[in-house]
Amino acid sequence: AVQPAQEEPMAEEVVPEEPVPEEPAPEEVPTEAVAANFNLDEQEYQVLLRIVEAEAGGEDTVGKMLVANVIMNRVNSGIFPATVTGVVYQNTECGAQFAPTVDGRIDRVSVSQDTTEAVNRVLGGEDVSQGALFFRSTRSRSSWFDQSLNRVLEHGNHIFYTL
């Protein structure tokens, strides 16, 4: 190991002769793996790809992973429907959970390679969302999110929340 160069000590300064410990290499992937990998059939997989592209097509890979994490966190929550299609198309008394299912964007998108890779990483167990179950656009002004949920992070054009 190469030791960093040390400056010459001044006459009255005492410099210990201890070796400098080597720093461990930082982790390359700062993501948390969830307990199990997800196995989706082709229809569920396509719905997940399309909603991620519709919601986060202009985001970077992490932004796309965050949206996919929210969907999969909901699937596994026991609070929301237990399928991707059920989560994505769920309607509540407040309306649709995901705007692209209402305005038709989910059916018009072309899924990018980056979106496919981001979704595959999430399906492989990566969770960069800190368990988020909700997100909203930074452009929307919904006080319900901030009053009712715990904000966990902001990335790109979205803010993410947990219960």
Pin down the residues of each PLM region.
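Intrinsically disordered, low-complexity, repeat-rich polar/charged segments
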Residues: 1-22
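Bacterial extracytoplasmic/cell-wall-associated proteins, especially those involved in peptidoglycan
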Residues: 16, 21-163
